[in-house]
């Protein structure tokens, strides 16, 4: 009985650690890609171009950030 309880406890701990590490990795990835500058690749649905730029998808799947003024 103690072995079953220990196994359940261990499984829960492994799940918590795995979930926490995947969330941390996601935060790191999002932090690396704060915004994309002019002529950088972007994703239209993600709105990842810097201020003053918009994501243009004239030739999908290669969308690029273009200047709002021209």
From Swiss-Prot:
Tissue: Expressed by the venom gland.
InterPro entries: Beta/delta-agatoxin_fam, Spidertoxin
Keywords: Amidation, Disulfide bond, Ion channel impairing toxin, Knottin, Neurotoxin, Secreted, Signal, Toxin, Voltage-gated sodium channel impairing toxin
Main localization of the protein described in the UniProt heading: secreted
Function: Insecticidal neurotoxin that modulates the insect Nav channel (DmNaV1/tipE (para/tipE)) in a unique manner, with both the activation and inactivation processes being affected. The voltage dependence of activation is shifted toward more hyperpolarized potentials (analogous to site 4 toxins) and a non-inactivating persistent sodium current is induced (site 3-like action). Interestingly, both effects take place in a voltage-dependent manner, producing a bell-shaped curve between -80 and 0 mV.
Taxonomic source organism: Agelena orientalis
Other comment: Negative results: does not affect mammalian sodium channels (Nav).
Compartment(s): Secreted
S-S bonds: 35-50, 42-55, 49-65, 57-63
Propeptide span(s): 21-33
Any one GO cellular component localisation term in the record: extracellular region
Modified residues (Asparagine amide): 69
Family to which the UniProt record says this protein belongs: Belongs to the neurotoxin 07 (Beta/delta-agtx) family. 04 (aga-5) subfamily.
Domain comment in the entry: The presence of a 'disulfide through disulfide knot' structurally defines this protein as a knottin.
Record-given protein name: Mu-agatoxin-Ao1a
Coiled-coil stretches: none
Disulfide bond keyword on record: yes
Signal peptide location: 1-20
UniProt-recorded Gene Ontology molecular function terms: ion channel inhibitor activity; sodium channel regulator activity; toxin activity
């Amino acid at each position: 009985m103690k072995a079953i309880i220990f196994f359940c406890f261990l499984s829960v701990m492994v799940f918590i650690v795995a979930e926490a590490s995947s969330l941390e990795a996601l935060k790191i990835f999002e932090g690396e890609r704060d915004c994309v500058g002019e002529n950088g690749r972007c994703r239209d649905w993600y709105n990842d171009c810097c201020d003053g730029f918009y994501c243009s998808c004239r030739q999908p799947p290669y969308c690029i950030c273009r200047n709002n003024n021209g």
